[in-house]
């Protein structure tokens, strides 16, 4: 899940992996909101099964990635995962900061919950 500071009305779900030749592949979708996601707390979830990865906001699924049987070289998604929460500045996804960039920025997290079956 990713958001862009200059676009707080859209949340992105993207899978990133390498194809059989080692080239970067990405596949994703997004969910737009009439109000800024930054205006209040939301429940974000990523649920993985042996066949799919689902992205949800406030209980509503907005993207699903198929990883069944390692389709399209997605077998890496069957292995262990880790959670990374961060605020990044710059890069290819959002571009470099400029005079309109607001600093400082913050990410408020109420809780993180992990469970398995």
Residue spans for each PLM region:
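GH16 jelly-roll
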Residues: 1-117
